[in-house]
UniProtKB/Swiss-Prot annotation:
Gene expressing this chain: VIM
Name assigned to this protein: Vimentin
Annotated positions of the N-acetylserine modification: 2
Biased composition (Low complexity): 1-13, 20-31
Chain span(s) of sequence motif [IL]-x-C-x-x-[DE] motif: 326-329
One example GO MF annotation: structural constituent of cytoskeleton
UniProt region (Coil 1B), positions on chain: 154-245
Modified residues (N6-acetyllysine): 120, 129, 139, 168, 188, 223, 235, 294, 373, 445
Disulfide bonds: none
Protein species of origin: Sus scrofa
Residue list for modification Phosphoserine: 7-10, 25-26, 34, 39, 42, 47, 49, 51, 55-56, 66, 72-73, 87, 144, 214, 226, 299, 325, 409, 412, 419-420, 430, 438, 459
Major subcellular site: cytoplasm
Cross-link type Glycyl lysine isopeptide (Lys-Gly) (interchain with G-Cter in SUMO2), residue numbers: 104, 120, 129, 139, 223, 262, 294, 313, 373, 439, 445
């Protein structure tokens, strides 16, 4: 009789040892083993096949066949009809005892491993609870502190940005209005400058007219003076002539008195004198009238020129006052524009600095949020790994429980009583030789997944003969 014991542990396939654990992977393998056993012998026990379905953290599903079979080393047993071969029974009992001893040792080891697994599962559950508490605490802190602070600061920043945008728009509108006012004032200044230039040119022409009138007046005054001098000279000459004539008349009168016989010259002289006096009076009157007319014309022209000059001076003074007032207004508007531009530049600089600070704050908060997310993701991955390990350990525990229950049920079966067997004599030579083979078909199915989707699936068949 020969005995073959096949035992395997899915823990070694999953962890590689009592205290190690493998990382999760994205592939799964399904291994199915079917075992058929054909044996000859009256005392041969049927083989038992157990399938273990285990799940490791890497997603590997394996099926193993553990069978304990007892086979006879000879094709048949030669027994007498009324006698029992007790040596064969002793050999079977000895072999069965050895098998039971080995199974007890293996069960003891399995119990020790099972106790270690339970301790490890309890430790991992405690760690899992601690990590869950830390995760809930971090979630609560993130929701209560960081989220509120971030939202409040973002609202404050948005409010300040909106206020600065409104201030900037208002300042730009004021700047545009001031620019329009400045353009309008510049156009008005240009118009006033043109009018002033026209007034200055008119004033210059008036000044030339005044100068010409002054020259004409001086010329006329000189002419009047010369005429007055001429009139005085003519009057003096006339007086002298009159005196001479009177003297001549007196002399002639004396001569007439002396010489009565001479012709009467008094009447002739009187007539001549009257003629000269009438001519002189006429000339004097004409000269006075001409002088008066000329003087009146010159006075009127001078008055007109004086009025025009006075009006031009008044207009020039008015234009000068307007130019000064407009210059003052332009200077004031320039100062206001410069101050507004300076304020606008300062506001833009302050806005840029505040915006940069807000961007830095937002970036820092986003970095903190990203770090918190990464830390939460890391905790979630660790939690998932622990869950996978826990599931694997639960499946391993269930598997060992099934093994233990199967072994307990097998141990509780009664042993066969060889003394009560009704055996008959059999000729070994008359029995045909039957070649006993055990055919095992191994199906390996590999499925690769990524993000919950199947990306590759392969199947392999292996046939083994025993």
């Amino acid at each position: 009789m020969s005995t073959r014991t096949v035992s395997s542990s899915s823990y070694r396939r999953m962890f590689g040892g009592p205290g190690t654990a493998s990382r999760p992977s994205s592939s799964r393998s399904y291994v199915t083993t079917s075992t058929r056993t054909y044996s000859l012998g009256s005392a041969l026990r049927p083989s038992t096949s157990r399938s273990l379905y285990t799940s490791s953290p890497g997603g590997v599903y394996a099926t193993r066949s553990s069978a304990v079979r007892l086979r006879s080393s000879v094709p048949g047993v030669r027994l007498l009809q009324d006698a029992v071969d007790f040596s064969l029974a002793d050999a079977i009992n000895t072999e069965f005892k050895n098998t039971r001893t080995n199974e007890k040792v293996e069960l003891q080891e399995l119990n020790d491993r099972f106790a270690n697994y339970i301790d490890k599962v309890r430790f991992l559950e405690q760690q899992n609870k601690i990590l869950l508490a830390e995760l809930e605490q971090l979630k609560g802190q993130g929701k209560s502190r960081l989220g509120d602070l971030y939202e409040e600061e973002m609202r404050e920043l948005r409010r300040q940005v909106d206020q600065l945008t409104n201030d900037k728009a208002r300042v730009e509108v004021e700047r545009d209005n001031l620019a329009e006012d400045i353009m309008r004032l510049r156009e008005k200044l240009q118009e006033e400058t043109l009018q002033r230039e026209e007034a200055e040119s008119t004033l210059q022409s008036f000044r030339q007219d005044v100068d010409n009138a002054s020259l004409a007046r001086l010329d006329l005054e000189r002419k009047v003076e010369s005429l007055q001098e001429e009139i005085a000279f003519l009057k003096k000459l006339h007086d002298e002539e009159i005196q001479e004539l009177q003297a001549q008349i007196q002399e002639q009168h004396v001569q007439i008195d002396m010489d009565v016989s001479k012709p009467d010259l008094t009447a002739a002289l009187r007539d001549v004198r009257q003629q000269y006096e009438s001519v002189a009076a006429k000339n004097l009157q004409e000269a006075e009238e001409w002088y008066k007319s000329k003087f009146a014309d010159l006075s009127e022209a001078a008055n007109r020129n004086n009025d025009a000059l006075r009006q031009a001076k008044q207009e020039s003074n008015e234009y000068r006052r307007q130019v000064q007032s407009l210059t003052c207004e332009v200077d004031a508007l320039k100062g206001t524009n410069e101050s507004l531009e300076r304020q606008m530049r300062e506001m833009e600089e302050n806005f840029a600095v505040e915006a940069a600070n807000y961007q830095d704050t937002i970036g820092r908060l986003q970095d903190e949020i990203q770090n918190m997310k990464e830390e939460m993701a890391r905790h979630l991955r660790e939690y998932q790994d622990l869950l996978n390990v826990k599931m694997a350990l639960d499946i391993e525990i269930a598997t060992y429980r099934k093994l233990l229950e199967g072994e307990e049920s097998r141990i509780s079966l009664p042993l066969p009583n060889f003394s009560s067997l009704n055996l008959r004599e059999t000729n070994l030579e008359s029995l045909p030789l039957v070649d006993t083979h055990s055919k095992r078909t191994l199906l390996i199915k590999t499925v690769e997944t990524r993000d919950g989707q199947v990306i590759n699936e392969t199947s392999q068949h292996h046939d083994d003969l025993e």
